[in-house]
Amino acid sequence: MRKRKVRTVFFIFLLLFATGLVGCGQKNIHKRNLCHIVLEAGDGYRVTDPARTVESGSDVSFTVTLDDNWQLLGTDYHGETEITKESDEKTVKIVLHKVNYSESICIQAEKGKYEITYDANSGKNISGDSDRVSIYYLGTHQRINTSIGTDLFTRDGYTQLGWNTRADGTGQAVGLGSRIAWKKGLVLYAQWVPWTDEKDFVYKEVSGFAVITSYTGKEQQICVPSSLGGLPVRTIREQAFADTDCKTVILSPGIYEIEKWAFRNSRLEQLYLYDDLVKISDYAFQDCDMLRTLHINAIEDPAYSGNYFDTFQDKYDRLLSLKDKKKIVLFSGSSTRFGYDSEMIDQAFSDYEVVNMGVFAYSPALPQLELIRSCMKEGDILLDSPEFDAANRQFCYQKELDYATFAMMESNYDAFAGLDLREYTQTFTAFSAYQAARQDMERKNYDICASNYDEDGHEVEEPSYNEYGDYVVYRPNSTSEEPIYGLPVNYTVNAFPKETYIDSVNAEFQKFLNQGIKVYFTYSPRNKYALSEESTKEERIRLHEYFKSQLNVPVISELEDSLYTGIYLYGTDNHLSTEGAQIRTEKVIHDLKNQLKKEEGE
């Protein structure tokens, strides 16, 4: 029986009381070095043999059976906990590693509310039971992450390409692990693609793996098999698919590396891959000028769940849900996450919904803005406030993607498929960097939500993000006006060349304007003492006039209003305190109202 393994590590700083109380039980040091471990009873599950006695320093395992609709979230064990869920989604094996003393352990379980039924659709249930499997979800996100599929169903000679709301594939498609809006009675059907005939591949055996050296077929759609000649396919060598006249390539799970020039000068238009592919670079697709779409299916557990990168997809969920409604979208990097009280904007502009799409300034803004634009309509408002310390990214000049781009896509890879790869560079090199970055990270699950953690990754009792996407953990004012970092930023005309930054951001703004979307430029907050020596008052006046004359959208705010004493900043030189965010929001509301009133009078 195939199992999906989730390895989670729980670290708790223990306060040793005289009584020896730990967690839910009592710590006892036994002369015979024996430890008595008990899994406590609770709602939603049953434990087989809940009491065990083992030698100190050894592992102890338990089998837990979940009730219908329940999910096991973890335990309060202080050490490393290994949780293995069988494909029936009800039987769970818990292994507590290196127990050193006696204690009772609490299991954390919660009842799922949202049922999705998965249909094998000519595939086979891995558990050998029914061709349909129902899974219940907690609904921690506005949309629900689907099953990765490969842990539910299999089909000899086929690769699962995704899910669809109709068996014949004519309904709504969703990638494995990506998100879908839930509705009662939702059924998702596995979508299968047959492997391309083995005779079309030339390969050799290397260390027990198949290495593809050439493709001799002429199919418009190629599905590279998971195995050839009974050997798992691991690598696609240089030039293997060079000059191939095909439109679609599907890389099956298990393929580890795509070497440089593997698809050089092919007619490839769209590519499917799984997130267990580790080594790949843009050299593999050199001169593939027609490649525009990348579909990524999840097969690995997520690493960035609960991280601020993960907030992008939660914000994107809200944006999608408001696609047909009138809205104001706030954008830049983390200064926008920290810098607005969106409820105030909502109240001030009651005809509009509000979405805060700010996440991270040091990743290219261009792909983020393109995804945002796809969800906006005529009459909507984009309020952009680029961060000057990341100007090459924030002004859409940087076309190279990076690891953070994919970190923001991890919990919904389908969003990335909405981008046209021809508008960007270093796509696959960035994906490889993302894979390297998360290689040694603790793996989590999609039910973990960023709003359960603060900016530093600590659990919080109240949600850290509100419905709009603002970071709302209380941030007191500082006691010092001094900058946090020694990073003086240039607020000078020379720092924003027209042929690079201005022309690039204007080109992106024009795409919004062409759709009838109103775009306004305001300034991101900054500690006024964290500017370069060249950024004098006179130079800042010149810069403000420069933006007003060169940008193709209205500059609605005064630059000087964006410079704050350090008292109103928190932790960095551009993250506002709670009070600072309210002060800034009041100013922006005033500026936006004046601009809209001015336009009404024209």
For every predicted segment, state its role.
Residues 1-32:
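Gram-positive cell-envelope targeting signals
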Residues 327-414:
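Membrane-embedded segments
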